[in-house]
Design a protein with these regions (language model features):
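Active-site segments that bind and position negatively charged phosphate/pyrophosphate groups
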Residues: 1-93
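C-terminal charged capping/lid subdomain of soluble metabolic enzymes
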Residues: 82-149
Length: 149
């Protein structure tokens, strides 16, 4: 509804409530790898956080799903998929349906930015990476950024 009309007060109310509830969850549980990898991108190029997350999340989910197959299978099924093996593709389809099918390259990130973002992520977002169900090496973080471009 909101994507069709920014003047829709009811839709803004629903989005605001969802954002508030999401913020409360983040306050208790913290955030995960997607947020940790996105912050350097949005800090470097002034990217809207949600668009940066859209560019990175499917790639990160591909790497996280084997660590928590039941949870990622559940997410996949909610989005019309079959199990954890197609969770990232289910997310990609959802993002396309809501016009958020973006790459970091579309948002101004270039390959020359990868080293700086990787170093920044490993230094500033280590807590977010540690909140993930698997360990992300510096090399893997750089690879995720490159794939997202």
């Amino acid at each position: 509804m909101l994507m069709e009309s920014y003047d829709n007060d009811r839709a803004w109310e629903a989005v605001s409530l969802a954002a508030t509830l999401g913020g409360m969850v983040i306050g208790v549980a913290g955030v995960s790898a997607a947020h940790g990898l996105e912050h350097p991108a949005s800090g470097l190029k002034n990217i809207v956080h949600g668009r940066g997350l859209a560019a990175l999340t499917p790639i990160i989910v591909d790497r996280l799903a084997p660590a928590l197959p039941q949870k990622f299978a559940e997410v996949s099924k909610i989005l019309g998929g079959k199990d954890e093996t197609d969770c990232a593709d289910s997310i990609r389809k959802f993002l396309k349906a809501i016009d958020l099918d973006v790459k970091l390259g579309d948002l101004g990130i270039v390959q020359d930015d990868v080293q700086w973002m990787t170093d920044n992520c490993m230094k500033i977002s280590a807590g977010n990476l540690n909140n993930a169900p698997k360990v992300f090496s510096k090399e893997e973080v750089a690879e995720i950024y490159s794939l997202a471009i």
